[in-house]
Amino acid sequence: MTSHLLTGVRPYGEDPTDILITDGTITAIGPDAAAKAPADVQRHDLDGLIALPGLVDIHTHLREPGGESAETIYSGTRAAAVGGYT
């Protein structure tokens, strides 16, 4: 089991709080997240950073005219996901 405790993060830009993530799933948000963390939790100080849910680009152009051979749908969507958009 892998756990990460994000401390001082600002969900949606609100007041700073802690977020506990266990095996890739958010398991606790708030001041009690640290108390629920296992002893071997990996701590990450995110003071001043904002946490947002996954972002979705609903308007995208893949394989622009004249550049069809430079990109495939697979490579274009993979590049978007690596860049933080799903």
Name every feature range the model reports, one short phrase each.
Residues 1-38:
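N-terminal metal-binding scaffold of metallo-dependent hydrolase/deaminase domains
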Residues 10, 39-40, 57-60:
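Generic preference for well-ordered secondary structure
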Residues 20, 28, 45, 57, ...:
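Short, conserved beta-strand segments within well-ordered enzyme catalytic domains
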Residues 35-51:
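Active-site metal-binding motif and surrounding structural segment of the metallo-beta-lactamase
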